[in-house]
Every structure is written in C-alpha cells, then in structure tokens.
Amino acid sequence: MNPLLSAARVAIAVVWALGMLLPPSTWADGMPYVVKPIAEMKVKQLPKGPLYWRVENFPTLDQAKAAAGEYRWNPNTVTYDGWPSLTAEAAGKVFLFTLGPQGATTPGGTKVAEIGPVPSITAPEYLLRVNYGSGPPGSKTPDHSHFGSEAFYVLTGKLGQKTPHGISYVEAGHTMNGHMAGMPMEVFNAGTNDLTALIMFMVDATKPFSVPATLP
C-alpha cells in the first residue's frame, strides 16, 4: 500500500473521529480546516542537542531524496548517523524537511525557513510528520492537542492559532514554532484569502496523533 495514501486515510479518520467526539456546533461555527499528511517517518531516537526544522526547496524530488541521505542506526556508536529528513511535493514545489542543528544547510537546496528550537519530548518512539493544511476564510480545526509539538510555515493567507496563552498570527512566508506537548489549540484561517500551510510535527508515536481538548 502507498504509505502516503495510508497516512492520508489515517488523517481523514482522525478528523472524522474528532468531529464525532465534539459537539456539532464545533463544526457549524466554521468550515473545517483540512489537513493531509504528505510525509512521515518513525524513529527510535532523536539527534542530540537543540533541534530545528529546516525547510528547503529542490529542483526535483529525486534531488531532494538524494541530498537527504539516510538516518541509520550505527551499532558501533550506538546511535543514529545523519539527520532525520522528509521529502514531499506541495503547492507545485519540492520540499526537504530536516530535523537538525540550527544554521545548517543541505548542498543543492535553497533554504526557505528554519523553525525552532523544537520543544523536546521523551518517548519510546517518535513520529515525524509533515501535513499540508488548507482552508477558506473562516475555516478552523476542532480544539485539540498533540503528544508533541507542531511548527508552521505559511504558504498563502494568514494563519491564526488560539491557545490558553492567547491568539497568535502568521502571515504568508513566515513561521511559528510549536508549543510543548499537550497544549490545547485551535488553528484557523485568520485572513480573507485561502490559507495553505506546511505543518511539521514531532510527536510520541506510541500515542494517538491528535486528541480532543478544551480551550478556556
């Protein structure tokens, strides 16, 4: 089975489950903001040190995959070699997403954004996932939380995020770092045009990807 197709089905199931667990008024207040997984990987161990999401463009998907290399277990050093990387096509462009140190670059790539430091978590296994989010003005997600963090790079429009700390906004071409695990949130289109965004997750792979939450 195509892994991205399988992931997309999981995303649809998650959105459906959230909708079933929340009152109908949650969806009636605005159109749903749709998210679709475009890349993911699971790892048993994360690189050491503060980690940043690095977003880069490449001319072709093959070039991005070749530049990414492999994140492989080395029994001699009892650790992983390389940096965990994901490749995907979105909005007519090829992206390479790397979880690594601040200020690094990938040969052949054009840096688009760097987001971090990513709030750390401890888990038996980690899921790194990139979602493509989209929605018209007024669209929003149900109130939810993750067992990890999510970071945003907005492609078009204006993104809003409501948490117990308040409301934050991100314009196209800009980023927003994630919160600590368990943060209740609502993500919504805060502009007058269609919103599209790349959303990078680092979460506990042994727990549900997303769960309903309550905002004050």
Residue ranges and their predicted role:
Residues L4-E150, K158-P216:
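Jelly-roll (double-stranded beta-helix
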Residues L155:
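A cytosolic small-molecule/anion-sensing beta-strand core signal
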